[in-house]
């Protein structure tokens, strides 16, 4: 007997249910918005890691170089929403959540501010990182992690 090939949406839904059960011991109907956010984020991280490994292997095989980008801040925006959009999964995930009467916008709201910047420099750095990803350039962004949140800059007698 042949095993039925699942669609991308069916696979995602099964992963979602399984991860909620394994990681949080709840069903989708019982899960809090925070638990759903954590599970969806973990699912996307796993997908991105697989894609990254494939990309790294490919660039290494052709002798590709790597860019290291240093900035005081990165204003990346909401990672879950951006990742779902970039992986073309917004419609599937929205539909899966709708099956359980869950509003995806409430899940997006669970994401904490990364605290990596608040100005034009941070937005520019994020655009450079997006551009590298879009163009297939292997790169990593480095910044300072502030212990007490985003800093304020003030020029005194200058």
Predicted regions: what is each one?
Residues 1-158:
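A conserved ligand/cofactor-binding region detector
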């Amino acid at each position: 007997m042949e095993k039925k090939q699942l669609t991308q949406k069916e696979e995602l839904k099964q992963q979602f249910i399984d991860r909620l059960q394994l990681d949080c011991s709840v069903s989708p109907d019982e899960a809090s918005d925070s638990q759903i956010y954590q599970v969806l984020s973990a699912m996307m991280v796993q997908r991105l890691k697989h894609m990254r490994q494939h990309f790294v292997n490919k660039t290494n095989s052709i002798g590709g170089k790597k860019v290291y980008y240093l900035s005081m801040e990165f204003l990346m925006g909401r990672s879950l929403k951006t990742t779902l959009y970039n992986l073309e999964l917004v419609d599937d995930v929205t539909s899966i959540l709708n099956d359980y009467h869950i509003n995806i916008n409430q899940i997006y709201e669970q994401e904490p501010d990364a605290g990596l910047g608040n100005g034009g420099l941070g937005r520019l750095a994020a655009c450079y990182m997006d551009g590298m990803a879009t163009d297939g350039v292997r790169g990593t962004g480095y910044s300072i992690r502030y212990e007490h949140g985003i800093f304020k800059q003030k020029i005194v007698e200058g």
